[in-house]
């Protein structure tokens, strides 16, 4: 029918072995456009046990395969994966990646009119701004959003990847796949 199909694949402790197997054996459906790997986050129904860790050899193996093997489809990652892409690959063009867009290019608005830099803050609402009687612009310019952006400005001083990574996720620091000594998340 001419429709491009992208598969979104949540990558966690419960799925990384299958992802490695599928990549190694080119076992994704023929004709797909891309596989977009989304890093598991411990929010909503997500659990802490599924969070990947940088020292897990499977994580290194997964990124080595992605970095060195050729596929008949594109591979993409969510912005939460960028610390791992920067730390564990050499052949992925740095110009093709961007880190967390929360409060930089996007915001999330809850059903009860709370503006958040990212939907993953919808449980703790640490950076929430109530727009039920206010504007989206005021939320964007708020101290809460500025505090969130400040993480990206000040994290991981001295790291060579700082400008591309910006320290990773301030909401769920346990998902940041980085082992650099400069890591401050």
Where are these regions (language model features)?
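Radical SAM enzyme [4Fe-4S]-AdoMet core and its adjacent flexible, acidic
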Residues: 1-131
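Flexible mid-to-C-terminal extensions adjoining Fe-S/redox cofactors in radical SAM and related proteins
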Residues: 114-115, 119-185
């Amino acid at each position: 029918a001419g429709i491009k199909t992208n598969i979104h694949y949540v990558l966690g402790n419960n799925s990384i072995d299958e992802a490695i197997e599928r990549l190694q054996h080119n076992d994704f459906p023929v004709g797909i456009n891309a596989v977009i790997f989304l890093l598991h986050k411990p929010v909503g129904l997500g659990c802490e046990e599924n969070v990947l860790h940088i020292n897990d050899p499977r994580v290194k193996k997964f990124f080595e395969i992605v970095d060195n093997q050729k596929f008949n489809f594109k591979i993409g990652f969510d912005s939460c994966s960028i610390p791992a892409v920067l730390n564990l690959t050499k052949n992925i063009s740095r110009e093709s990646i961007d880190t967390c867009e929360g409060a930089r290019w996007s915001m999330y608005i809850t059903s009860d009119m709370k503006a958040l830099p990212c939907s993953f803050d919808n449980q703790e609402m640490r950076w929430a701004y109530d727009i039920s009687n206010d504007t989206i612009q005021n939320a964007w310019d708020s101290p809460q959003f500025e505090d969130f952006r400040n993480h990206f400005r000040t994290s991981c001083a001295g790291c060579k990847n700082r400008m591309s990574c910006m320290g990773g996720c301030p909401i769920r620091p346990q998902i940041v796949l980085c082992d650099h000594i400069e890591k401050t998340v």
